């Protein structure tokens, strides 16, 4: 290494590291009696993930409160006001507080998303974009994190409503065993 060089990783927005769990709870109107599942569809949303989540929402709400970042134009107005469920197209200022509130996270496997989730030590389920819809980089990212014990992975082509529900419950039950917690 040369004296004037610095080796870095992916830049992380520092404000994400300073979230306040109670501020997040207040923003969402959630109670402290159930764990919080945060679903991030990316800036464009993840239509198939959104659809599956909405189909299993009644089952999810038995055990979780759900924050659903569904992407621009992807909100389902019929679900507005559902107890224990909030949906947003996009969140900026409150995002650190929502991350602090989340017990487990479901996300795509883009490089920035997984680096932020890693920095926050959040147990996570990654649903990478399919090889048909991408360069395949998200699949490689997700499998790398899974192999190291940092994440659980569910391929988009393999998702069924029941499989997603079962995997979410497994993620929560095994959240302390994911080695990401210990990074």
Each model region followed by its residue ranges:
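Donor-nucleotide binding loops and adjacent catalytic segments primarily
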Residues: 21-23, 30-105, 139-143, 147, ...
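Active-site-proximal region of nucleotide-activated glycan assembly enzymes
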Residues: 3-22, 27-30
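Short beta->alpha connector loops at strand-helix junctions that form conserved
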Residues: 8-10, 127-130, 154-158
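Short, hydrophobic alpha-helical segments
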Residues: 168-176
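Short hydrophobic beta-strand element within catalytic cores of glycosyltransferases
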Residues: 107, 123-135
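Conserved small/polar residues in nucleotide/adenosyl-binding loops
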Residues: 1-5, 181-183
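Acidic donor-binding loop of glycosyltransferase active sites
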Residues: 88, 100-115, 122-123
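Short acidic/histidine- and often glycine-rich active-site loop of Leloir-type glycosyltransferases
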Residues: 7, 116-119, 135-148
């Amino acid at each position: 290494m040369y004296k004037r060089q610095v080796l870095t990783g992916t830049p992380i927005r520092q404000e994400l590291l300073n979230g306040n769990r109670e501020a997040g709870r207040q923003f969402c109107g959630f109670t402290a009696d159930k764990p919080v599942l945060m679903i991030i569809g990316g800036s464009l949303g993840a239509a198939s993930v959104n659809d599956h989540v909405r189909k299993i929402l009644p089952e999810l709400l038995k055990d979780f409160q759900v924050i659903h970042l569904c992407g621009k134009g992807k909100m389902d107005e019929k679900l507005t006001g559902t107890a224990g469920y909030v949906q947003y197209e996009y969140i900026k200022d409150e995002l650190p507080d929502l991350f602090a509130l989340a017990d487990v996270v479901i996300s795509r496997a883009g490089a920035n998303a997984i680096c932020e989730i890693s920095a926050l030590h959040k147990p996570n389920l990654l649903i990478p974009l399919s090889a048909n819809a991408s360069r395949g980089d998200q699949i490689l990212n997700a499998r790398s994190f899974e192999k190291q014990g940092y994440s659980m992975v569910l391929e988009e082509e393999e998702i069924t409503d029941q499989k997603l529900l079962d995997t979410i419950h497994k993620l929560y039950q095994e959240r302390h065993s994911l080695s990401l917690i210990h990074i």
